Amino acid sequence: MSDTFIIKILHGGLGDHLFFSHLPGIAKKSGGVRQVLISNLSVYRHPDYRRLIWEANPYVDGFTDEDAPFPGFSSVPKGTNLLDYIMIFRGLDDGKRFHEPELHFKPERIDSLAGATVYDPNYVSDVGNLESEHIKRYFARKKIMPDFMLKPRGKGAPVERYGTLIETKSLEHYCSVIASARRFICLTSGGATLAAALGIPVMALWGPGQLTMFHHSHLHNYVNVNPITLRQRCQTKLNRYSQALHRRSIGFVNKLLNK
């Protein structure tokens, strides 16, 4: 391996960058790399990601205009998680599995959130078939009443029963909210990956259709709030059987007509 290791992140989300955040340390500790650089071809949805994830990483030496390989995949092998797969794809292997993302930052605590349940309804990347109604029903079943909710943005699943709205002003502020809450509940998106990087277990909600490779952290409790019931499974199988039988019937009739 070259003594310079370059990282490029093509997808600009918070979680997308954190999926690569363990690589600089591994490259220097286990990969025999002298210098780690972040490609300027990387995409950022927010400038805070570059500053807090990469510029604050002690194993990152700077930035470069050079390109670097970027993995494309929709699943990971058993016994590994998403971060392991990226590590191995990039030619590194420290022998460990189920890596957690890294953030070299210690957030300040917010006293008013101590002992509170905080719900973040926002997401950018796909979280599966999930809507506000599914969250409300799940909270009602589990007798969960959030004390605070983050202010809803463009995409999300807000609930009606909440206390004061919190509007995060920066990535550091968001980290402080996660670190200060007694219980943090979010969707299985960037917030869950950020919490893993902070070493904080959360309840991460998702729905059918989300790729399970995004359930990457052993710290978290990943909850499907819109599970397919046994009746729905049976109905789906019955529909498929009926469609197959219909196609066979049409084929049989066509054969008779063509004789």
What spans do the regions from the language model cover?
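Catalytic machinery of carbohydrate-active enzymes
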Residues: M1-K259
